[in-house]
Amino acid sequence: MVSWIISRLVVLIFGTLYPAYYSYKAVKSKDIKEYVKWMMYWIIFALFTTAETFTDIFLCWFPFYYELKIAFVAWLLSPYTKGSSLLYRKFVHPTLSSKEKEIDDCLVQAKDRSYDALVHFGKRGLNVAATAAVMAASKGQGALSERLRSFSMQDLTTIRGDGAPAPSGPPPPGSGRASGKHGQPKMSRSASESASSSGTA
């Protein structure tokens, strides 16, 4: 059985790259017939890719599933079967022609709703961002003011500790007693000196 990798490579090379190159040649040569042919192929291949997304999930267990995918892409590309032109002319074009107005209305409504939703969520996002910015700024300002206040209090206490003047009030009680005690020996010494001088005289 063909594995998923081989199937993916075949679809990528022969279902995408090969038609892309020939689409380039059709645009370059301005061949209307080839241009229409490859446009029909790309429409069918887009539908195939969309369906493949779901069938790979739910039908990958089916026997010969990947072989059928390769055979389908080859059938689309074959100039003998002209599978893409057949599917487009028989099914896709009539369906799109009958449902074109409804599809256009749905696309317009989806576009308007998506624009309104984008504007709504954009406004909400801006409001949330503005609120977060204001809260962050207020918190930062509060922290800065607290730090400045703490710095100013530290500076004030430092100035008081370094340059504080001496107290100008009366001396404490203990200082008078100390001076009196130290003054008594001086007085007794002067009295003894005067007595000795009078005795010698």
UniProtKB/Swiss-Prot annotation:
Residues 188-201 have a biased composition (Low complexity). It is a multi-pass membrane protein. One of its GO terms (biological process) is protein insertion into membrane. The modification Phosphoserine is found at S152. The keyword Protein biosynthesis does not apply. Residues 158-201 are annotated as: Disordered. GO terms for molecular function: microtubule binding; olfactory receptor binding. Expressed in circumvallate papillae and testis. It holds the Pfam family TB2_DP1_HVA22. InterPro entries: TB2_DP1_HVA22. Keywords: Disease variant, Endoplasmic reticulum, Hereditary spastic paraplegia, Membrane, Mitochondrion, Neurodegeneration, Neuropathy, Phosphoprotein, Transmembrane, Transmembrane helix. It is found in: Membrane; Mitochondrion membrane; Endoplasmic reticulum. The chain crosses the membrane at residues 1-21, 35-55. The keyword Metal-binding does not apply. One of its GO terms (cellular component) is cytoplasm. Required for endoplasmic reticulum (ER) network formation, shaping and remodeling; it links ER tubules to the cytoskeleton. May also enhance the cell surface expression of odorant receptors. May play a role in long-term axonal maintenance. Belongs to the DP1 family. Interacts with SPAST and ATL1; it preferentially interacts with SPAST isoform 1. Interacts (via C-terminus) with microtubules. Interacts with odorant receptor proteins. Interacts with ZFYVE27. It is linked to Spastic paraplegia 31, autosomal dominant: A form of spastic paraplegia, a neurodegenerative disorder characterized by a slow, gradual, progressive weakness and spasticity of the lower limbs. Rate of progression and the severity of symptoms are quite variable. Initial symptoms may include difficulty with balance, weakness and stiffness in the legs, muscle spasms, and dragging the toes when walking. In some forms of the disorder, bladder symptoms (such as incontinence) may appear, or the weakness and stiffness may spread to other parts of the body. Neuronopathy, distal hereditary motor, autosomal dominant 12: A form of distal hereditary motor neuronopathy, a heterogeneous group of neuromuscular disorders caused by selective degeneration of motor neurons in the anterior horn of the spinal cord, without sensory deficit in the posterior horn. The overall clinical picture consists of a classical distal muscular atrophy syndrome in the legs without clinical sensory loss. The disease starts with weakness and wasting of distal muscles of the anterior tibial and peroneal compartments of the legs. This is Receptor expression-enhancing protein 1.
